Amino acid sequence: MAPTKKVPQVPETVLKRRKQRADARTKAAQHKVTVAAKNKEKKTQYFKRAEKYVQEYRNAQKEGLRLKREAEAKGDFYVPAEHKVAFVVRIRGINQLHPKPRKALQILRLRQINNGVFVKLNKATLPLLRIIEPYVAWGYPNNKTIHDLLYKRGYAKVDGNRVPITDNTIVEQSLGKFNIICLEDLAHEIATVGPHFKEATNFLWPFKLNNPTGGWTKKTNHFVEGGDFGNREDQINNLLRKMV
């Protein structure tokens, strides 16, 4: 009878490595499933928030229309609520610039031509806008304009660096503590001038826009005189469509 051959034993270190690799694969698979579930949950949350904001906007429009009709029926004038937020674009350079408007432009972070920022309209900012008026075009952005600026031209300030807002994670990491976790939240906070408007706008790097399609008309004249500078109220939306 032939002697039985011994099956060579697998070294213990090899077995340990195999187990470690198997455990690692299992953990990686579990992590992948967990991340996918969290991402799905977040996407649902983003969608619900966006829906909620759209409904709020529509309700506000309907209410405004109702009040206008009610006033007209009584023979009165309808006075809409005062605008709370402006978008300001620098349109002129620094040649022969007086120190006072230069300082005001720096305060508003409008350091270069075609830089743009959102500004909360109040007793502190309105005097600044009057000082810099010959050097800027400004007005009242609507919801669509705010969305277009954020989605097409939005950059964040992260650790002093200009970072493109490629996904909602960037927003959540910086503003999650204020319950602003996505671009829709950011747009809503700006449009409504929410309690964390300052944090929201400081998170954004000043927008860098193009010259308007077709060019400027006359930068040294006020908008009401057929020029470019100054408050153009709702017409700022037409200008920004040409610059985004």
Swiss-Prot record:
Segments of this protein annotated with the region Disordered? 1-37
Gene Ontology molecular function, alphabetical: RNA binding; structural constituent of ribosome
Q: Could you tell me the keywords of this UniProt record?
A: Ribonucleoprotein, Ribosomal protein, RNA-binding
Q: Entry's SUPFAM superfamilies?
A: Ribosomal protein L30p/L7e (SSF55129)
Any one cellular component term from GO for this entry?
A: cytosolic large ribosomal subunit
**Pfam family of this protein, just one?**
Ribosomal_L30_N
**Keyword check for Ligase:** no
Cited PROSITE patterns: RIBOSOMAL_L30
A GO biological-process term:
maturation of LSU-rRNA from tricistronic rRNA transcript (SSU-rRNA, 5.8S rRNA, LSU-rRNA)
**InterPro entries, per this entry?**
Ribo_uL30_ferredoxin-like_sf, Ribosomal_uL30, Ribosomal_uL30_CS, Ribosomal_uL30_euk, Ribosomal_uL30_euk_arc, Ribosomal_uL30_ferredoxin-like, Ribosomal_uL30_N_euk
Q: Which family does it belong to?
A: Belongs to the universal ribosomal protein uL30 family.
Summarizing the function annotation, the protein's role is:
Binds to G-rich structures in 28S rRNA and in mRNAs. Plays a regulatory role in the translation apparatus; inhibits cell-free translation of mRNAs.
By what name is this protein known?
Answer: Large ribosomal subunit protein uL30
